[in-house]
Amino acid sequence: MSVLMSDPGERIALPLQVGDHVIDPPVVLAPMAGITNRAFRRLCRESGAGLYVSEMTTSRALVERNAATMDMVSFAEDEYPRSVQLYGVDPQVMAAAVRIIVSEDRADHIDMNFGCPVPKVTRKGGGSALPWKKDLFASIVHAAVDAANGRVPVSVKMRKGIDDDHLTYLQAGRTAAEAGVSWVALHARTTQEMYSGHADWSAIARLKEELDPLDVP
C-alpha cells in the first residue's frame, strides 16, 4: 500500500484506523519471519511507514514463555503502534497468547497469520492451509477476538487459497469480519504460487466488495 500524490501539495490516501490507533501514512511493513525484528523495524521507521509488524510469532511458544519468542514480542520505546503477528492451529492456545499480550501490555495491535505458504507450516495444517478447515479457522479467529476483549484490535492476513481449485479467501474474509476483526489483509496469491508470478489484484477488489457491507476494510 502506498500514498499516491498527483502533486506534492495534494493528499489522496487517507490514514488507516486500527482500533483507536491512526496509521498515518497508511503504509504497513508486512511481517516477515526472520526479517522484521527490532533492528530492521528501526531502519524502516526512519523511512516513515505508519505500522511495523513483528516477525511471525508462534502462539504456543509465547504461552510457554520461550525466551527467544518473548524477545520477538518486545519493542523499542519509540515504536508505536506496537504490532505482533501470531501463528497457531489451536484456538485455546491462540486465546491464551492473546491474553498474555493484552494483559501484559505487550502490543497495540495483533495480527493472525493465515498466509504463510512455507511447507513446514502448511504440513501441520497452519498458515495459508488453515482457512480450508472452515470450522477451525472460525474457532481460532473467534478465540483471539474474544480474548482481546476489545482492548487490542485484531486482524488477519491470508492468501487466496491453497490453489486455484481450493480458494478460501471470500468465505474466510466473511468469517473473520463477522467474528469482529478490525481488518482483513489479502496476499493475492495461492499457497501453490508461493511468491512467484503476479498478485491477483482483482481478488483484492472482490474481497473488498464482499466485506464492504460488514464495514470491515
Set out the residue ranges of the language-model regions.
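Flavin-dependent oxidoreductase catalytic cores
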Residues: 2-217
